[in-house]
């Protein structure tokens, strides 16, 4: 989908990717929101500075908002509608200046604005009825802020997704393969990823139908099961794709205008996921992950100096891996990239010429020596029974362990 975008958009995404690589955010969604909000402010400042120049060419950079209504409204209700447009999220509707300005997101789910949640619930309800939504045009003078949904993850245990339907094993495998490398799903655990797949809604689309239209408000992400689609930007065909591909990812992050028009070039079977469902799954997964890892982190003496907030941030950055008996986790001499915390299981630590020098079990840790001293791995670690570990990458090790790093240095066996 990225390759179907104009070069300017690809350049913007590359800048974003560079920021991600540099910051390695534990909360990707909030980092993204903050980043694009800043970029939008930069764009508005650029346009404002050049407003006289464009006025001289009869180009209106900051038009007054207009509205189209499917039914008459009173003056009072029209006033309310205008007010809502003026203060909506900057990512809701199409930006008419996308061709004028060319470019050269730490989230606490309990501290989000309720306004966007209400809007999303209303939109979700409208889609199930025959009454069409009221189209609103972009207003460039509105305040540039990003609203988030107020989603209470501790209430998710009783939540049932609207479109939940168990998929067959074959469907699960195909759909999992389709979303495996998508950056939005990389941090989901296997249970949450399976829930996402089972929440995908089947949609049949005939040949020639427009699936999404450039500039329209985006609420759905799509996976192509059967058929082929073409992508158009400004009426120019830029790409094609078929079974196993996906598009519309940005719609799951925020109300983003569609970057391209997608047309079915054959009869298609698609799977669709709406943004509200995805965000509930994502935040629910993060909340459960924090709860699960909090007990583990509190039980480890080396991490006792971390505050509750520090533990929460660390939990968000941890990944889980399972190793079977006899499987090598790290090998002596290899480059060290991860720090390991044993959730359960047992491992042997061995060195060449010395054999097994240590045995580790539940709530022990290893892999810190190479990261503390920027050295190759000093020993081989092998699972002796089924072992589940929480892993932390090198950048997260340096950023998130804080005062615990000093304790790790005191316990570093290479310094004794």
Curated annotation (Swiss-Prot):
InterPro entries: cAMP-dep_PK_reg_su-like, cAMP_dep_PK_reg_su, cAMP_dep_PK_reg_su_I/II_a/b, cNMP-bd_CS, cNMP-bd_dom, cNMP-bd_dom_sf, RmlC-like_jellyroll
GO biological process, one term: protein localization to bud neck
Protein name: cAMP-dependent protein kinase regulatory subunit
Subcellular location: Cytoplasm; Nucleus
Region: Dimerization and phosphorylation, residue numbers: 2-183
Post-translational modification Phosphoserine, affected residues: 3-4, 9, 68, 70, 74, 77, 79, 81, 83-84, 130, 145, 147
Annotated region described as Disordered, given as residue ranges: 65-138
Quaternary data: The inactive holoenzyme of cAMP-dependent protein kinase is a tetramer, composed of 2 regulatory subunits (R, encoded by BCY1) and two catalytic subunits (C, encoded by the 3 partially redundant TPK1, TPK2, and TPK3 genes). Activation by cAMP causes dissociation of the holoenzyme, producing 2 active catalytic monomers C and a regulatory dimer R(2).
First-listed, main subcellular location of the protein, grouped into a coarse class: cytoplasm
Record-stated family: Belongs to the cAMP-dependent kinase regulatory chain family.
One Pfam family here: cNMP_binding
Domain-related comment: The inhibitor sequence (IS) is a substrate recognition motif that docks to the active site cleft of the catalytic subunit rendering the holoenzyme inactive. Binding of cAMP to the 2 tandem cyclic-nucleotide binding domains (CNB-A and CNB-B) induces a conformational change in BCY1, causing the interaction surface with the catalytic subunit to be destroyed and eventually the dissociation of the R dimer from the C subunits.
Signal peptide span: none
The organism's place on the tree of life at top rank: Eukaryota
Sequence ranges of Low complexity compositional bias: 70-84
Keyword Translocase applies: no
Motif position, Inhibitor sequence (IS): 142-146
Entry binding sites for 3',5'-cyclic AMP 2: 302-416
